[in-house]
Regions:
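Conserved anion-binding
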Residues: 72-158
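Metabolite-binding pocket within alpha/beta catalytic cores that recognizes anionic/polar moieties
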Residues: 37-99
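C-terminal helical cap(s) of enzyme catalytic domains, especially alpha/beta-barrels
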Residues: 50-56, 97-100, 106-107, 212-230
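Catalytic cores of alpha/beta
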Residues: 24-25, 65-84, 177-210
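Alpha/beta catalytic cores of nucleotide-metabolism and tRNA/nucleoside-modifying enzymes
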Residues: 1, 12-13, 17, 113-115, ...
Length: 230
């Protein structure tokens, strides 16, 4: 039985390219977060992804892999879901559908019960994901709402993900996305480093994702962001 990702309020994102200090995996897994997402834009390999899985899988928390390339789209008995992103505001079609085609063209088999497609709207042009995908980040509230409607109502993505990637976002933009979404679960990620920021975005989005704070601020801040939304 796969974990019910639709009910999660707080997800912690861990980057396989970043090292966790000794004991950190257990502290993160027992912080109260609903799930762990293993995800990164640069320098993610099967080797460092599996190393991180080895660290976090013993604690029984739901695990998601979010692959940045077909090589890391793995089906592993330790993970619950594969969240596969399409950057819908990318200027390079490879990040919308091209890499997905490559993955399916060469895959031996796909466990579709594990796959959850995500419509990413990337809004930080200075982030790695913004640069790599060539995302058009200069979007108004109406622009974002239109992308949400395309993703949610036309393409029927089950997740719409507002991604500021390392920078705290504009609540009015996230509110516009929330107002536009009808069916999908709305995720927000980017720059959450305090309980106050977690609470603010948690009131708008269905699920908040906390990532860099784990490495930069430490476990106490992570726990505070969990308490703010649960």
């Amino acid at each position: 039985m796969h974990a019910n990702w639709k009910t999660w309020a707080h997800v912690t994102k861990l980057d396989p390219d970043k090292r966790l200090p000794p004991g950190a995996a257990e502290e993160i897994a027992t912080s109260g977060t609903d799930a762990l997402m293993l995800s990164g834009t640069l320098n993610v390999t099967q080797e460092n992804l599996n190393e991180l899985l080895d660290q976090v899988s013993p604690y029984g928390l739901p695990l998601v892999v979010e692959p940045a390339s077909p090589d890391c789209a793995i089906f592993d008995g330790r993970i619950d879901h594969l969240f596969v992103p399409s950057v819908v505001n990318a200027n390079d079609v490879r990040w919308i559908v091209g890499k997905h085609y490559t993955w399916l063209r060469h895959a031996n088999s796909i466990d579709w019960d594990m796959v959850v497609p995500e419509a990413y709207i990337v809004l930080n042009p200075n982030s790695a994901v913004g640069r790599v995908t060539g995302a058009d980040c200069a979007l108004s509230c109406r622009d974002v709402a239109a992308f949400v409607e395309v993703a949610d109502r036309y393409f029927r993505f089950p997740i719409v993900y507002i991604e500021y990637s390392g920078r705290y976002g504009d609540p009015s933009i996230v509110q516009a996305a929330s107002d536009a979404v009808e069916h999908a679960v709305l995720y927000y990620g980017g720059g959450i480093r305090s309980a106050e920021q977690a609470a603010e975005m948690g009131r708008i989005a269905d699920t908040i994702v906390v990532g860099n704070a784990v490495y930069d601020e430490g476990i106490d801040v992570l726990r505070a962001t969990v308490r703010a939304v649960q």
